[in-house]
């Protein structure tokens, strides 16, 4: 029983609140239920520390509700909007417009997901004790992880 508990404790589901670098997490939440769980986990991880969110989404999801939930959570101090390299992506400008509707926090947009990731890392280094979260799509998680594995 002890070995089973230890194995469960050490199990990591790739792309689900996965810490890919110190204080940098990727989560493939891509619907309102997933975003709700993501927000709970992000809040638990960062506590009162500042959090930066990198976000993208595909156009056939309930993206406006997801964006509203993220903005209303009060967890994130900065938002980075990126466009994924999939035909299903929602244009970055559209995502940015929706975030602007729900929050006055700083918004920065990138055409390339990994450029946004690098900017997020830079912000995380500049903002003391901050955490970077990347979410909105499993495609996004995959793009970032692939670039990291390939050494960009």
Residue ranges and their predicted role:
Residues 1-78:
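Nucleotide phosphate-binding/pyrophosphate-handling subdomain across enzymes
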Residues 24, 67-131:
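C-terminal helical cap/extension that packs against the catalytic core
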Residues 42, 70-71, 98, 150-152:
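Glycine-rich, phosphate-binding/catalytic loops in enzymes
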Residues 134:
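Acidic, glycine-rich flexible loop segments
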Residues 137:
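Active-site-proximal loop/hinge segments that shape catalytic or ion-binding/gating pockets
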Residues 140-142:
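Short, active-site-adjacent cap segments at secondary-structure transitions
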């Amino acid at each position: 029983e002890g070995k089973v508990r230890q194995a469960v404790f050490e199990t990591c589901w790739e792309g689900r609140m996965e810490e890919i670098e110190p204080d940098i997490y990727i989560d493939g939440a891509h619907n309102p239920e997933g975003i709700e769980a993501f927000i709970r986990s992000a809040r638990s991880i960062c506590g009162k520390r500042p959090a930066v969110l990198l976000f993208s989404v595909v156009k056939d999801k309930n993206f406006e509700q997801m964006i509203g939930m993220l903005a209303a959570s009060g967890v994130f101090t900065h938002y980075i909007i990126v466009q994924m390299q999939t035909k299903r992506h929602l244009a970055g400008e559209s995502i940015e417009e929706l975030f602007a509707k729900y929050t006055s926090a700083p918004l920065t947009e990138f055409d390339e997901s990994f450029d946004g990731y690098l900017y997020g890392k830079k912000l995380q280094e500049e903002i003391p004790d901050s955490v970077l979260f990347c979410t909105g799509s499993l495609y996004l998680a995959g793009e970032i992880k692939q670039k990291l594995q390939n050494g960009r």
